[in-house]
Swiss-Prot record:
Compositional bias per record (Low complexity), positions renumbered to this chain: 193-208
Keywords: ATP-binding, Coiled coil, Helicase, Hydrolase, Nucleotide-binding, Nucleus, Ribosome biogenesis, RNA-binding
Helicase C-terminal domain location: 427-606
Organism this protein belongs to: Cryptococcus neoformans var. neoformans serotype D (strain JEC21 / ATCC MYA-565) (Filobasidiella neoformans)
Protein name in the entry: ATP-dependent RNA helicase DRS1
Gene name tied to this protein: DRS1
Length: 793
């Protein structure tokens, strides 16, 4: 039976050319290009560029901040322009003048050129300042040499031969041996606490990233970011980190410590569990400042994106939205980059967020995190982390004190200290300017910025108020500057960094908030308006320039109170890195006079800014009250946020950190004068080292003898009190409370024998024998007075 297809339509016959030959175009064999190269970077060969402008995104927006530049421009009557804008305008004016004067005579041209040179800015002529120019005296010119000679004189004092007896010699030897024993004990503690570093004796350290057995996506990311060869800290730290060992890493500033811990972290996350229950927060990176945390996140994201790695980051810092961060934490990101305060806030108040699955803990700038102000928060975070984690600590001035590191529960850590004798970069030139009085400090800074240092400069100050005031001064002098300190909002802080990176502003006036970790390309000069209180802080400040093998310089204004810090800075630096800069006294005097003219303008600008802040604060209070009225139920229904400390404990911790920071600075002004008046001359002043030690030993012996006598007298007094009392003395005993008043009190009273003793000298007890007095007996005493008796009817 034939097949019957229903509802089908017969198709037309198709013409098929199958089997017929077709004419194909003839392909010519081209020769191989000898200059052809594979693009390992995927067409993206640019390096890692931080602070490009995306960091401001996601910042919690508020009211528009007060722009001080607007107030200054209204006061000056003209805008403040950056150096490159001023230079561009000057070049355009020069070219237009040349076009108009092409047909003039040579004499006129020469006259015009001379006039232009006279009327132009003196900045071009004074760009290169000779180190010997100025009216400095011989003391200023030989300042550094005199400090070096002081070290030599101290060593000579130790070797001078004085007449002393054998007893004094033995005392000196004993004191030296005690110090050696203490040093040996400390070395023994460190040997027991730390593990030996196998990379120190290994001659085959990896010279390239391919020799570290990293995954191909990560190698691709490193190549695209122009990480050609590992730095010494990376070559030693990355293999140890891949083995899961605890590390203490220390290297000079700008040596790539962030990549030293971020590369092994990403390599380990490539092999994590990707199953249904594999999502967890596995890595935590702690940073002391928000800006450093933002920078670490940028480095990690750049490596992950260029390598195509499926790794998610979460940034937990202040100034960002709490709700947005809590929503991100619900997705269980792989890497958390946080500051201690905001992390504890989420651990305490965000539901279901824990660090129980943490594998790696990294503490960047660990020496700062171990100082006062962070210790309580760090201990709380360590308690929340599992004991089996891997811990890595990194800093340019890393400490190896066992007493401080024992708080972190490290497991046989390895010290990876690259070139521990050097704390500053090789390309850094350190210049010092002597300031005879504090009144000339600000004019000297302005003279430097107007004459020599005109762009890409970071200036460090001790206080936030001083940094803000100097920004106003810079604006009045026509210098474009931005400020970076803790009184600004997070949006303002990040915007200041981006403007400085883009060249919109020439100077970044900052506190020590910006001294650690920040990597801003193009920073040519760092100026210390005043020397810091600690040598480590000075190292971090000057480390913002001369990074990654580049050249840079630091200029420090040094007063008489900073002499000790200057001596320490020169001692740790190499001789060819230290310079002495002299600013001409005429320039300083001119700036001082001009600054005196602007004194009233500065006060007016500060007053106007304060009034504007008060007005905005009043508007904010009004808006807050309206929200409380309109959304009262919703606001009070929110759970209150808690903290692991009470208000007093939190304030005490904050005050301790501030006091430690302020106390490190040398005292100046009236307080220093008072201290000098109190201690005009010490009891050891003028003595040689040997006589000083002998006198101190005699005083110690006298103190020990006095303490021994005091102890002996105490023992004798205790023995005397422990002896039983003589039999002739009345022995006290306790008697139960009787009737009357003693019964109401309910207490036992002390009495002696019932009838007293014949040897009672006070005469208060009854006497015995012939001299006993007759007792008076009241016969009516036992009768009962009126009232119903018990048996009466």
């Amino acid at each position: 039976m034939a097949d019957d297809f229903i509802t089908t339509i017969d198709s037309d016959d198709e013409v098929s050319n199958y089997g017929e030959p077709s004419a194909l175009p003839k392909i010519k064999d081209d020769e191989l290009d000898p200059d052809f190269q594979f693009d390992l970077g995927g067409g993206r060969s640019e390096g890692l560029d931080l602070w490009g402008g995306d960091e401001v995104q996601g910042v919690k927006k508020g009211n528009e901040p007060i722009n001080v530049d607007d107030i200054i421009e209204r006061k000056r009557g003209k805008p403040i322009r950056a150096f490159k804008d001023r230079k561009r305008k000057r070049d355009e004016d020069a070219t237009s003048e040349d076009d108009l004067e092409e047909d003039e005579e040579e004499e006129g041209d020469s006259n015009d050129d001379s006039d232009a040179a006279k009327s132009g800015d003196s900045e071009e002529d004074e760009m290169d300042v000779d180190m010997s120019e100025g009216d400095g005296d011989e003391e200023d010119e030989n300042e550094i040499e005199s400090l070096k000679r002081e070290d030599e004189s101290d060593e000579e004092e130790e070797e001078e031969e004085d007449d002393y007896d054998e007893e004094g010699e033995n005392e000196v030897v004993d004191s030296d041996s005690e110090s050696e024993e203490e040093t040996a004990a400390e070395i023994a503690r460190k040997d027991a606490f730390f593990s030996s570093d196998p990379t120190t004796t290994d001659p085959t350290l990896p010279s390239s990233f391919t020799a570290m057995n990293l995954s191909r996506p990560l190698l691709r990311a490193l190549t695209s970011l122009q990480f050609t060869a590992p730095t010494p800290i990376q070559a030693r730290a990355i293999p140890l980190a891949l083995l899961g060992r605890d590390i203490l890493g220390s290297a000079v500033t700008g040596s790539g410590k962030t990549a030293a811990f971020m590369v092994p972290i990403l390599e380990r996350l490539c092999y994590r569990d990707r199953g249904k229950g594999g999502a967890a927060c596995r890595v935590l990176v702690l940073c002391p400042t928000r800006e450093l945390a933002v920078q670490c996140e940028a480095v990690g994201k750049a490596l992950a994106e260029k390598g195509g790695l499926d790794v998610r980051f979460a940034l937990l810092v202040g100034g960002l939205s709490l709700n947005a961060q809590a929503h991100t934490l619900r997705t269980l990101p792989d890497i958390l980059i946080a500051t201690p305060g905001r992390l504890i806030d989420h651990l305490t108040n965000t539901p279901s967020f824990t660090l129980s699955a943490l594998d790696v803990l990294v503490i960047d700038e660990a020496d700062r995190m171990l100082e006062a102000g962070f210790t309580d928060e760090l201990e709380e975070i360590i308690k929340a982390c599992p004991r089996s984690r891997q811990t890595m600590l990194f800093s340019a001035t890393m400490t190896d004190s066992v007493d401080e590191l024992v708080k972190l529960s490290l497991d046989k850590p390895i010290r990876v200290f690259v070139d521990p004798k050097r704390n500053t970069a090789r390309g850094l030139t350190q210049e010092f300017v002597r300031i005879r009085s504090d009144d000339s400090r600000s004019p000297s800074l302005l003279a430097l910025c107007k004459r020599t240092i005109r762009e890409k400069c970071i200036i460090f100050f001790r206080s936030k108020a001083l940094a803000h005031q100097m920004r106003i001064v810079f604006g009045l002098f026509g210098l474009k500057a931005a400020e970076l300190h803790g009184n600004l909002t997070q949006e303002q802080r990040l915007q200041a960094l981006n403007d400085f990176k883009a060249g919109t502003v020439d100077y970044l006036l900052a506190t020590d908030l910006a001294s650690r970790g920040l990597d801003i390309k193009g920073v040519e000069t760092v100026i210390n308006y005043d020397m810091p209180g600690q040598l480590a802080q000075y190292t971090h400040r000057v480390g913002r320039t001369a990074r990654a093998g580049r050249k840079g310089r630091s200029v420090s204004l040094v007063g008489e109170a900073d002499r000790k810090m200057l001596k320490a800075a020169i001692k740790q630096a190499e001789a060819d890195q230290v310079r002495h800069r002299i600013i001409p006294s005429e320039a300083v005097t001119a700036m001082k006079e001009k600054l005196e003219e602007f004194k009233d303008d500065i006060q007016e600008i500060l007053k106007e800014e304060k009034e504007e802040k008060l007005l905005r604060q009043a508007d904010m209070e009004i808006k807050k009250g309206q929200n409380m009225v309109e959304h009262e139920a919703e606001i009070f229904s929110r759970p209150a946020r808690t903290w692991f400390q009470s208000g007093k404990e939190k304030q005490a911790s904050k005050s301790a950190g501030k006091d430690a920071y302020v106390g490190s600075f040398p005292s100046t002004g009236k307080s220093a004068e008072k201290e000098k008046e109190k201690l005009k001359r010490g009891k050891y002043d003028g003595l040689s080292r040997r006589l000083k030690r002998r006198k101190m030993a005699i005083e110690e012996d006298a103190a020990d003898a006095a303490a021994a006598r005091k102890t002996e007298m105490g023992i004798r007094a205790a023995k005397k009190n422990a002896l039983p009392k003589k039999i002739t003395e009345p022995q006290p005993r306790l008697e139960k409370a009787g009737k009357g008043k003693d019964k109401k009190k309910g207490k036992a009273r002390r009495v002696t024998g019932g009838k007293g003793s014949a040897f009672d000298s006070e005469g208060k007890k009854s006497h015995e024998g012939m001299r006993a007095k007759p007792a008076k007996v009241n016969l009516e005493k036992g009768k009962k007075k009126g009232g119903k008796g018990k048996g009466r009817k």
